[in-house]
Amino acid sequence: MKFIINNNILIKNLQKISRLLVKNTSLPILDNVLINIKNGMLSLTGTNLEIELVAMIQLSTEHISGTATISGRKLLDICRNSLNSSNIEMQLNNNKMHIISGNSRYILTTLPYDSFPVHHDFHHISEFFIPSDILKKMIEKIQFSMAKQDVRYYLNGILLEKTDRSLYAVATDGYRLGISKFFLKENIIPFSIVIPRKGVIELYRLLNIPKQPIKVLVGKNNIRVHIEDLIFTTQLIEGQYPDYKSVLLENKNNFITLNSKLLKQSLLRAAILSHEKFCGVEIHIRNGQFKVLSDNQEEEIAEDRFNINYTGNTVKISINVYYIIEILNSITSENIFLFLNNANNSIQIEAENDASILYVVMLLKR
Protein backbone atom coordinates (compact mmCIF):
# COMPACT_ATOMS: atom_id res chain seq x y z
CA MET A 1 0.00 0.00 0.00
CA LYS A 2 1.21 3.46 -0.89
CA PHE A 3 -0.50 6.80 -1.50
CA ILE A 4 -0.15 10.57 -1.20
CA ILE A 5 -3.00 12.78 -0.02
CA ASN A 6 -3.50 16.44 0.86
CA ASN A 7 -3.51 16.98 4.62
CA ASN A 8 -6.64 19.16 4.48
CA ILE A 9 -8.64 16.35 2.89
CA LEU A 10 -7.30 13.68 5.23
CA ILE A 11 -7.87 15.63 8.44
CA LYS A 12 -11.40 16.65 7.40
CA ASN A 13 -12.42 12.99 7.13
CA LEU A 14 -10.41 11.73 10.10
CA GLN A 15 -12.09 14.25 12.42
CA LYS A 16 -15.49 12.74 11.64
CA ILE A 17 -14.33 9.15 11.96
CA SER A 18 -12.31 9.72 15.15
CA ARG A 19 -15.52 10.45 17.12
CA LEU A 20 -16.31 6.73 16.94
CA LEU A 21 -12.92 5.45 18.06
CA VAL A 22 -12.81 3.95 21.54
CA LYS A 23 -9.97 2.72 23.73
CA ASN A 24 -10.91 -0.88 24.45
CA THR A 25 -8.39 -3.06 26.25
CA SER A 26 -10.18 -6.26 25.22
CA LEU A 27 -10.54 -5.12 21.58
CA PRO A 28 -7.69 -2.66 20.83
CA ILE A 29 -8.48 -2.60 17.10
CA LEU A 30 -11.47 -0.33 17.87
CA ASP A 31 -8.93 2.47 18.36
CA ASN A 32 -7.75 1.94 14.80
CA VAL A 33 -8.87 3.20 11.41
CA LEU A 34 -9.21 0.72 8.57
CA ILE A 35 -7.44 2.10 5.48
CA ASN A 36 -8.19 0.51 2.14
CA ILE A 37 -7.23 1.41 -1.44
CA LYS A 38 -9.04 -0.23 -4.32
CA ASN A 39 -9.71 0.95 -7.88
CA GLY A 40 -8.29 4.40 -7.15
CA MET A 41 -10.59 4.92 -4.17
CA LEU A 42 -9.29 5.41 -0.63
CA SER A 43 -11.67 4.43 2.16
CA LEU A 44 -11.23 5.23 5.85
CA THR A 45 -13.41 3.25 8.27
CA GLY A 46 -14.00 3.75 11.98
CA THR A 47 -16.36 1.84 14.26
CA ASN A 48 -17.39 1.41 17.89
CA LEU A 49 -19.24 -1.84 17.01
CA GLU A 50 -22.62 -0.08 17.22
CA ILE A 51 -21.88 2.61 14.61
CA GLU A 52 -19.68 2.47 11.52
CA LEU A 53 -18.55 5.42 9.42
CA VAL A 54 -16.76 5.10 6.08
CA ALA A 55 -15.18 8.07 4.28
CA MET A 56 -14.61 7.61 0.54
CA ILE A 57 -11.85 9.68 -1.11
CA GLN A 58 -10.91 9.63 -4.79
CA LEU A 59 -7.13 9.52 -5.19
CA SER A 60 -5.70 11.79 -7.90
CA THR A 61 -2.06 10.68 -7.67
CA GLU A 62 -0.22 7.42 -8.22
CA HIS A 63 -0.91 4.80 -5.58
CA ILE A 64 -0.59 1.12 -4.71
CA SER A 65 -3.66 -0.81 -3.56
CA GLY A 66 -3.75 -2.48 -0.16
CA THR A 67 -5.36 -2.64 3.27
CA ALA A 68 -4.12 -1.86 6.79
CA THR A 69 -5.27 -0.58 10.18
CA ILE A 70 -3.43 2.01 12.26
CA SER A 71 -4.20 4.13 15.31
CA GLY A 72 -6.76 6.72 14.28
CA ARG A 73 -5.88 9.11 17.09
CA LYS A 74 -2.16 9.05 16.33
CA LEU A 75 -2.79 9.59 12.62
CA LEU A 76 -5.11 12.50 13.43
CA ASP A 77 -2.49 14.04 15.74
CA ILE A 78 0.11 13.74 12.98
CA CYS A 79 -2.22 15.54 10.57
CA ARG A 80 -3.08 18.26 13.09
CA ASN A 81 0.59 19.02 13.64
CA SER A 82 1.37 19.16 9.92
CA LEU A 83 0.88 22.14 7.63
CA ASN A 84 -2.69 22.27 6.34
CA SER A 85 -1.62 22.59 2.72
CA SER A 86 1.07 19.91 2.92
CA ASN A 87 0.85 16.42 1.47
CA ILE A 88 0.88 13.29 3.60
CA GLU A 89 2.66 10.27 2.15
CA MET A 90 1.81 6.85 3.60
CA GLN A 91 3.41 3.52 2.74
CA LEU A 92 2.99 0.06 4.25
CA ASN A 93 6.24 -1.83 4.75
CA ASN A 94 6.65 -5.07 6.75
CA ASN A 95 3.40 -4.46 8.67
CA LYS A 96 4.55 -0.96 9.64
CA MET A 97 2.97 2.23 8.30
CA HIS A 98 5.60 4.75 7.23
CA ILE A 99 4.31 8.33 7.15
CA ILE A 100 6.10 11.35 5.70
CA SER A 101 4.83 14.88 6.32
CA GLY A 102 7.17 17.69 5.32
CA ASN A 103 10.39 17.19 7.27
CA SER A 104 8.77 14.76 9.71
CA ARG A 105 8.90 10.97 9.59
CA TYR A 106 6.73 8.51 11.53
CA ILE A 107 6.52 4.72 11.76
CA LEU A 108 3.27 3.35 13.19
CA THR A 109 2.36 -0.17 14.24
CA THR A 110 -0.48 -1.87 12.39
CA LEU A 111 -2.97 -4.51 13.53
CA PRO A 112 -4.32 -7.32 11.31
CA TYR A 113 -7.00 -5.80 9.09
CA ASP A 114 -8.94 -9.06 8.83
CA SER A 115 -9.91 -8.73 12.51
CA PHE A 116 -11.43 -5.27 11.97
CA PRO A 117 -15.24 -5.47 12.43
CA VAL A 118 -17.10 -4.19 9.35
CA HIS A 119 -20.69 -4.40 8.10
CA HIS A 120 -19.97 -6.42 4.97
CA ASP A 121 -23.19 -8.44 5.19
CA PHE A 122 -25.59 -5.48 5.02
CA HIS A 123 -28.79 -6.26 3.10
CA HIS A 124 -31.57 -3.69 2.82
CA ILE A 125 -35.30 -4.32 2.73
CA SER A 126 -36.34 -0.76 1.88
CA GLU A 127 -34.67 2.33 0.43
CA PHE A 128 -35.56 5.94 -0.29
CA PHE A 129 -34.14 9.39 -0.93
CA ILE A 130 -34.87 12.34 1.34
CA PRO A 131 -33.56 15.95 1.42
CA SER A 132 -30.80 16.24 4.02
CA ASP A 133 -32.35 19.32 5.63
CA ILE A 134 -35.69 17.52 6.07
CA LEU A 135 -34.17 14.52 7.84
CA LYS A 136 -32.10 16.84 10.01
CA LYS A 137 -35.21 18.80 10.96
CA MET A 138 -37.16 15.63 11.75
CA ILE A 139 -34.46 14.58 14.21
CA GLU A 140 -33.90 18.07 15.62
CA LYS A 141 -37.56 18.61 16.48
CA ILE A 142 -37.94 15.49 18.62
CA GLN A 143 -34.55 14.20 19.77
CA PHE A 144 -34.87 15.85 23.20
CA SER A 145 -37.80 13.50 23.91
CA MET A 146 -35.61 10.38 23.69
CA ALA A 147 -35.09 8.43 26.90
CA LYS A 148 -31.66 8.24 28.51
CA GLN A 149 -30.53 4.85 29.84
CA ASP A 150 -34.10 3.65 30.33
CA VAL A 151 -34.55 -0.03 31.22
CA ARG A 152 -37.08 -0.07 28.40
CA TYR A 153 -34.19 -0.10 25.94
CA TYR A 154 -36.42 0.55 22.91
CA LEU A 155 -37.14 4.05 24.27
CA ASN A 156 -33.43 4.97 24.12
CA GLY A 157 -33.67 6.02 20.51
CA ILE A 158 -35.96 7.23 17.75
CA LEU A 159 -38.62 5.23 15.95
CA LEU A 160 -38.41 5.72 12.19
CA GLU A 161 -41.26 4.24 10.24
CA LYS A 162 -42.92 4.52 6.89
CA THR A 163 -46.69 4.06 6.74
CA ASP A 164 -48.99 5.08 3.90
CA ARG A 165 -47.00 7.75 2.00
CA SER A 166 -45.42 9.42 5.04
CA LEU A 167 -42.19 8.96 6.97
CA TYR A 168 -42.55 9.34 10.75
CA ALA A 169 -39.87 9.98 13.37
CA VAL A 170 -41.03 9.41 16.95
CA ALA A 171 -39.29 9.84 20.31
CA THR A 172 -40.62 9.32 23.84
CA ASP A 173 -39.31 8.73 27.34
CA GLY A 174 -42.72 7.69 28.66
CA TYR A 175 -43.53 11.17 29.98
CA ARG A 176 -43.45 13.15 26.75
CA LEU A 177 -43.74 12.33 23.09
CA GLY A 178 -42.50 14.06 19.95
CA ILE A 179 -43.58 13.24 16.40
CA SER A 180 -42.31 14.67 13.12
CA LYS A 181 -43.41 13.53 9.68
CA PHE A 182 -42.57 14.04 6.03
CA PHE A 183 -44.57 13.12 2.93
CA LEU A 184 -42.63 10.83 0.60
CA LYS A 185 -43.36 11.29 -3.09
CA GLU A 186 -42.00 7.88 -4.00
CA ASN A 187 -43.77 4.68 -3.06
CA ILE A 188 -41.39 2.66 -0.89
CA ILE A 189 -41.65 -0.58 1.06
CA PRO A 190 -43.05 0.07 4.58
CA PHE A 191 -40.76 -0.41 7.57
CA SER A 192 -40.59 0.30 11.30
CA ILE A 193 -37.20 0.52 13.06
CA VAL A 194 -35.68 2.01 16.21
CA ILE A 195 -32.36 3.87 15.81
CA PRO A 196 -30.31 3.96 19.06
CA ARG A 197 -29.60 7.24 20.79
CA LYS A 198 -25.88 7.35 19.93
CA GLY A 199 -26.68 6.63 16.30
CA VAL A 200 -29.27 9.42 16.23
CA ILE A 201 -26.82 11.95 17.68
CA GLU A 202 -24.04 11.01 15.25
CA LEU A 203 -26.38 11.03 12.25
CA TYR A 204 -27.63 14.49 13.24
CA ARG A 205 -24.04 15.79 13.32
CA LEU A 206 -23.33 14.39 9.86
CA LEU A 207 -26.43 16.09 8.43
CA ASN A 208 -24.93 19.54 9.03
CA ILE A 209 -24.32 19.93 5.28
CA PRO A 210 -25.74 22.01 2.41
CA LYS A 211 -29.18 20.84 1.31
CA GLN A 212 -28.98 17.80 -0.96
CA PRO A 213 -30.73 14.45 -1.46
CA ILE A 214 -29.35 11.60 0.63
CA LYS A 215 -29.92 7.89 0.22
CA VAL A 216 -31.29 5.80 3.10
CA LEU A 217 -31.13 2.00 3.15
CA VAL A 218 -33.13 0.18 5.81
CA GLY A 219 -32.05 -3.32 6.80
CA LYS A 220 -33.40 -5.82 9.28
CA ASN A 221 -30.71 -5.10 11.88
CA ASN A 222 -29.07 -1.91 10.55
CA ILE A 223 -29.77 1.35 8.79
CA ARG A 224 -27.32 2.87 6.30
CA VAL A 225 -27.26 6.49 5.14
CA HIS A 226 -25.14 7.84 2.27
CA ILE A 227 -24.19 11.45 3.06
CA GLU A 228 -21.93 13.11 0.48
CA ASP A 229 -18.77 10.94 0.49
CA LEU A 230 -19.64 9.28 3.81
CA ILE A 231 -21.42 6.00 4.49
CA PHE A 232 -23.03 5.91 7.94
CA THR A 233 -24.27 2.59 9.34
CA THR A 234 -25.73 1.90 12.77
CA GLN A 235 -27.23 -1.12 14.45
CA LEU A 236 -30.91 -1.01 15.33
CA ILE A 237 -32.63 -1.63 18.65
CA GLU A 238 -34.77 -4.74 18.83
CA GLY A 239 -38.09 -4.66 20.62
CA GLN A 240 -41.67 -3.51 20.17
CA TYR A 241 -42.00 0.28 20.24
CA PRO A 242 -45.10 1.48 22.15
CA ASP A 243 -48.25 2.38 20.20
CA TYR A 244 -47.73 6.13 20.15
CA LYS A 245 -50.86 6.76 18.09
CA SER A 246 -53.06 5.63 20.98
CA VAL A 247 -52.22 8.78 22.98
CA LEU A 248 -52.97 11.22 20.17
CA LEU A 249 -56.18 13.22 20.35
CA GLU A 250 -58.98 12.30 17.97
CA ASN A 251 -61.15 15.26 18.97
CA LYS A 252 -59.30 18.56 18.54
CA ASN A 253 -62.18 20.91 19.28
CA ASN A 254 -60.96 21.93 22.73
CA PHE A 255 -57.80 24.00 22.27
CA ILE A 256 -56.20 27.28 23.30
CA THR A 257 -54.04 29.49 21.09
CA LEU A 258 -50.99 30.84 22.92
CA ASN A 259 -48.17 33.17 21.93
CA SER A 260 -44.99 31.08 22.02
CA LYS A 261 -42.75 33.88 23.30
CA LEU A 262 -45.11 35.01 26.07
CA LEU A 263 -45.64 31.43 27.22
CA LYS A 264 -41.93 30.64 27.30
CA GLN A 265 -41.09 33.82 29.23
CA SER A 266 -43.82 33.10 31.77
CA LEU A 267 -42.68 29.50 32.28
CA LEU A 268 -39.04 30.56 32.68
CA ARG A 269 -40.01 33.01 35.42
CA ALA A 270 -42.03 30.41 37.29
CA ALA A 271 -39.32 27.78 36.84
CA ILE A 272 -36.94 29.84 39.00
CA LEU A 273 -38.69 28.59 42.15
CA SER A 274 -39.92 25.20 40.93
CA HIS A 275 -39.05 22.03 42.83
CA GLU A 276 -35.51 20.91 41.98
CA LYS A 277 -36.53 17.26 41.62
CA PHE A 278 -40.06 17.34 40.20
CA CYS A 279 -39.85 20.63 38.23
CA GLY A 280 -43.61 20.92 38.38
CA VAL A 281 -45.71 24.04 37.84
CA GLU A 282 -49.44 24.59 38.02
CA ILE A 283 -51.21 26.24 35.12
CA HIS A 284 -54.55 27.97 35.67
CA ILE A 285 -56.52 29.21 32.67
CA ARG A 286 -59.60 31.27 33.43
CA ASN A 287 -61.43 34.37 32.21
CA GLY A 288 -58.91 35.30 29.53
CA GLN A 289 -55.92 34.87 31.80
CA PHE A 290 -53.08 32.33 31.77
CA LYS A 291 -51.46 31.91 35.19
CA VAL A 292 -48.39 29.85 36.11
CA LEU A 293 -47.60 28.98 39.73
CA SER A 294 -44.67 27.12 41.26
CA ASP A 295 -43.30 26.26 44.68
CA ASN A 296 -40.36 24.28 46.01
CA GLN A 297 -39.07 22.29 48.97
CA GLU A 298 -38.11 25.52 50.74
CA GLU A 299 -41.75 26.72 50.61
CA GLU A 300 -40.91 29.50 48.17
CA ILE A 301 -43.60 30.54 45.69
CA ALA A 302 -43.59 32.11 42.22
CA GLU A 303 -46.53 33.34 40.15
CA ASP A 304 -46.69 34.80 36.66
CA ARG A 305 -49.61 35.63 34.41
CA PHE A 306 -50.51 37.06 31.02
CA ASN A 307 -53.70 37.73 29.09
CA ILE A 308 -55.02 35.37 26.42
CA ASN A 309 -58.08 35.09 24.21
CA TYR A 310 -59.99 32.36 26.03
CA THR A 311 -63.53 32.27 27.40
CA GLY A 312 -64.02 28.53 27.94
CA ASN A 313 -64.17 26.46 31.10
CA THR A 314 -61.59 26.90 33.83
CA VAL A 315 -58.50 24.73 33.32
CA LYS A 316 -56.15 23.61 36.09
CA ILE A 317 -53.23 21.32 35.28
CA SER A 318 -49.80 20.45 36.68
CA ILE A 319 -46.89 19.76 34.36
CA ASN A 320 -43.10 19.52 34.16
CA VAL A 321 -42.10 23.06 33.21
CA TYR A 322 -38.92 22.08 31.38
CA TYR A 323 -40.75 19.66 29.10
CA ILE A 324 -42.81 22.57 27.78
CA ILE A 325 -39.82 24.90 27.54
CA GLU A 326 -37.90 22.36 25.44
CA ILE A 327 -40.86 22.06 23.10
CA LEU A 328 -41.10 25.83 22.75
CA ASN A 329 -37.37 25.98 21.99
CA SER A 330 -37.93 23.69 19.01
CA ILE A 331 -40.98 25.52 17.62
CA THR A 332 -40.40 28.52 15.37
CA SER A 333 -43.99 29.65 14.81
CA GLU A 334 -45.35 32.71 16.58
CA ASN A 335 -48.24 30.82 18.17
CA ILE A 336 -48.93 27.30 19.35
CA PHE A 337 -52.13 25.32 19.81
CA LEU A 338 -52.55 23.69 23.22
CA PHE A 339 -55.07 20.85 23.03
CA LEU A 340 -56.70 19.61 26.22
CA ASN A 341 -57.40 15.94 26.82
CA ASN A 342 -60.85 15.08 28.17
CA ALA A 343 -59.26 12.40 30.36
CA ASN A 344 -57.13 15.18 31.86
CA ASN A 345 -53.96 13.09 31.79
CA SER A 346 -52.04 14.82 29.00
CA ILE A 347 -51.88 17.84 26.71
CA GLN A 348 -51.04 17.99 23.03
CA ILE A 349 -49.05 20.86 21.52
CA GLU A 350 -48.84 21.77 17.85
CA ALA A 351 -47.22 24.65 15.99
CA GLU A 352 -49.58 27.10 14.31
CA ASN A 353 -47.77 27.09 10.97
CA ASP A 354 -46.17 23.64 10.91
CA ALA A 355 -48.43 20.59 10.76
CA SER A 356 -45.44 18.25 10.44
CA ILE A 357 -44.67 18.21 14.19
CA LEU A 358 -46.66 17.62 17.36
CA TYR A 359 -45.96 16.87 21.01
CA VAL A 360 -47.77 15.14 23.86
CA VAL A 361 -46.84 15.74 27.50
CA MET A 362 -48.21 13.74 30.43
CA LEU A 363 -49.64 15.78 33.29
CA LEU A 364 -48.44 15.53 36.89
CA LYS A 365 -50.80 14.36 39.59
CA ARG A 366 -51.65 17.10 42.02
From Swiss-Prot:
It comes from the Bacteria. Gene3D superfamilies: 3.70.10.10, DNA Polymerase III, subunit A, domain 2. One of its GO terms (biological process) is DNA strand elongation involved in DNA replication. One of its GO terms (cellular component) is DNA polymerase III complex. CDD domains: beta_clamp (cd00140). InterPro entries: DNA_clamp_sf, DNA_polIII_beta, DNA_polIII_beta_C, DNA_polIII_beta_cen, DNA_polIII_beta_N. Forms a ring-shaped head-to-tail homodimer around DNA which binds and tethers DNA polymerases and other proteins to the DNA. The DNA replisome complex has a single clamp-loading complex (3 tau and 1 each of delta, delta', psi and chi subunits) which binds 3 Pol III cores (1 core on the leading strand and 2 on the lagging strand) each with a beta sliding clamp dimer. Additional proteins in the replisome are other copies of gamma, psi and chi, Ssb, DNA helicase and RNA primase. Confers DNA tethering and processivity to DNA polymerases and other proteins. Acts as a clamp, forming a ring around DNA (a reaction catalyzed by the clamp-loading complex) which diffuses in an ATP-independent manner freely and bidirectionally along dsDNA. Initially characterized for its ability to contact the catalytic subunit of DNA polymerase III (Pol III), a complex, multichain enzyme responsible for most of the replicative synthesis in bacteria; Pol III exhibits 3'-5' exonuclease proofreading activity. PANTHER family: BETA SLIDING CLAMP, DNA POLYMERASE III SUBUNIT BETA. Belongs to the beta sliding clamp family. This is Beta sliding clamp. It comes from Buchnera aphidicola subsp. Acyrthosiphon pisum (strain APS) (Acyrthosiphon pisum symbiotic bacterium). The lineage of its organism: Bacteria, Pseudomonadati, Pseudomonadota, Gammaproteobacteria, Enterobacterales. The gene is dnaN.
